[in-house]
Each structure stands twice: as structure tokens, then as C-alpha cells.
């Protein structure tokens, strides 16, 4: 399936990418079976993002970042606390009514307590997997925070989580959710029909632009075949006029799009009706 080409009549729509954390790593740590490429290893930067769709009508938050406790435990370098980032953008998390969890890894599903009034949308496959014994195996469990999973399960019991069964779902007219898998069993990508063309929020279906451009899978995966298929889907979407893709962790995102605050260009970038980037 391809994303809908029907573009809603939103007032002043924008997609905001918030850079809330960073760390230094290496190619051999980031890319699956890196030695197969017969290249020298090299240092890389991994940035951590969450995303916001905002118009005059609605604000939707996509993923929630890692918690302060997780940052300390995993030696990640916070750039801005997600709560402070929202405040800088003029967003009160209590006013957020709709929140998407693309997957349940610690760096995407912390801080859910910031959003007491949000209905949370995620893949049923993703939700159910992390409640299984397999999800607790070390190679899977390393990437989640058990406290996040407990909170997600509690929110589901409270009726605040909507679980999606279909591979494609309309979040609201103009925003489609696609279950691509690969990185995790229910990894989702979000496609926003902006006036200039679709904005593909790949989340961790791709971490870096290199994955798409060099067909180079990330090291953390549930299904290698599904990861490759996800790349193929995203490449198809990129054939559409004006389409842009936002990977889940590539610092180059901050160079490709216009800063929200010119005095602090490392804080956040935006894609809006004035152009897809710089």
C-alpha cells in the first residue's frame, strides 16, 4: 500500500524533530555484521529524537524519549529533557490528547507519565511481544526499560492504549501509521501528508540515512528480512513528489531541515508549508 495523496486542509501544519540526547559510537556497533563490508571502523554520532505534529487544530506527539533514569543508567548524554523541550515549544503535555508509540524501546517509550490525558496508539504485535518470555531474553530485553513496559501495560488496563492490528492504519485523516517490523516486531513508521509532500517519520525502521542509501541494516533487529522490506517500502514512498524521510537517530537530520530556533540550531528542526528543509 502507498500513503494516501489526499492532503487535509490543516491550518499552519508543521512537523517538529526534537533532538533530546546524543552519544558517540562506532560503525561496528551500529551496523549489523559490519565486518562483512570489509571497511575500516570509524566513530559515529548517534542522536536521539522524538517528533511532534502540530497544526492550529491539533498537537500529536510521536514517541516520548528516554527517561532521566535511563540516561544515567545507560550513560547517554541528555541534550534537553523532553518536558523542557515541550515547554520551549509552547506545548503543555497535559493538553496532548493523542500520542503514538512507534515501538517500545527505552529511548522511545520513557516519560509516558508526562501525558496524563493522552490516548496512546501502538501496534498490538509490539505491545504483546514485550509481555512474552521471548521479550525478556537478554538480546531483546537489553533494549527496553522494564518500568516502561510496566507503565504501558498499566495504561492498557486503564483503557488508554489503542492497539492496532492492521499493517496500515489512519491515525487522523492525513497521517498514516505503517507497521514495518524489522527493528522490533511491531515497529511503525508515520507518514504525514504535508502541503509540500509526505514527511516520512521512519523512527527506527531506519536509524541512519546510510541504511537506506547503502542497504546497510542496523545492528539491533528482530527480523533482518523485514528490515530490508521496510527499506523497500520507504524507498517507494520517497518516489512521491516532495517526499522527505526522517531517520530515527541520524545527526544529519539537524543539517537537512530548518531550525525551530535559529539561536539554538541543535535543539529542534521543523518541516512546514514554507519548505521541506534548507
State where each predicted segment sits.
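Active-site metal-binding loops of divalent metal-dependent hydrolases
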Residues: 20-21, 64-67, 104, 125-126, ...
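Active-site metal-binding motif and surrounding structural segment of the metallo-beta-lactamase
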Residues: 76-122
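Core dinuclear metal-dependent hydrolase active-site scaffold
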Residues: 9, 17-20, 51-54, 60, ...
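Cap/insert and terminal regions of metallo-dependent hydrolase folds
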Residues: 73-76, 84, 189-278
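Metallo-beta-lactamase
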Residues: 1-91, 95-98, 125-179, 196-203, 239-244, ...
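Histidine-centered catalytic micro-motifs
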Residues: 99-109, 179-187, 246-252
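Hydrophobic/aromatic beta-strand patches that form the interior of the parallel beta-sheet core
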Residues: 16, 100, 121, 162-164, ...
